[in-house]
């Protein structure tokens, strides 16, 4: 299994298709997020799906149960591998979403705590736990309810794996080739994330902003076994 999910963070449909075509044999999946979905909607997802690369649709759904269930109903018709929704939307929201995808290819992945957030950010929201404790709590809830996996940083991946078992998928964003500063707070290198127990690592700019995205993806994959 190729653990790389390449984030196609663009509003340009042609650019997304070009990346997807060039990377389909180099990565495990491509990620389409809110930026792309706001610009192109379901039809844009269908166009990228024609490139024959699995799609991780990262919409982070978070609304009342009925609204999320109806949204999942619409999305399940798309050819996507995984769809994200916030675990903090609650048990009822998650269970109703799961009921929609029973027997379908699409897997529901729960978002724990955004990697852009740290302990101070959670405290401002009235969350008394530190980020790691909050992630573990939410991951255990997701597992109990029946979600297929979670999104969490590499800093929590090892404990999530211990608590939730080997078949529970762990997707890790906040992947950086070095420890530079940007909009992410809880980060790790690709190898650190995999060694911590992640099944998939989400990598965007180090691949898409390189002069040769396919070659960059190959080098990252090779670095995981060096």
UniProtKB/Swiss-Prot annotation:
Annotated substrate binding sites: 9, 31, 58-67, 115, 176, 184, 204-205
Gene3D superfamilies, per the entry: Aldolase class I
SUBUNIT field: Homodimer.
UniProt GO molecular function: orotidine-5'-phosphate decarboxylase activity
Catalysed reaction, written as an equation: orotidine 5'-phosphate + H(+) = UMP + CO2
HAMAP family, A to Z: OMPdecase_type1_B
PROSITE patterns: OMPDECASE
Enzyme Commission number(s) of this protein: 4.1.1.23
Protein name: Orotidine 5'-phosphate decarboxylase
Pathways involved: Pyrimidine metabolism; UMP biosynthesis via de novo pathway; UMP from orotate: step 2/2
InterPro entries reported for this sequence: Aldolase_TIM (IPR013785), OMPdecase (IPR014732), OMPdecase_AS (IPR018089), OMPdecase_bac (IPR047596), OMPdeCOase_dom (IPR001754), RibuloseP-bd_barrel (IPR011060)
Role, per record: Catalyzes the decarboxylation of orotidine 5'-monophosphate (OMP) to uridine 5'-monophosphate (UMP).
Disulfide bond sites: none
Gene Ontology biological-process entries: 'de novo' pyrimidine nucleobase biosynthetic process; 'de novo' UMP biosynthetic process
UniProt entry keywords in alphabetical sequence: Decarboxylase, Lyase, Pyrimidine biosynthesis
Catalytic residue list: 60
GO CC annotation: cytosol
Originating organism: Wolbachia pipientis subsp. Culex pipiens (strain wPip)
PANTHER family: OROTIDINE 5'-PHOSPHATE DECARBOXYLASE
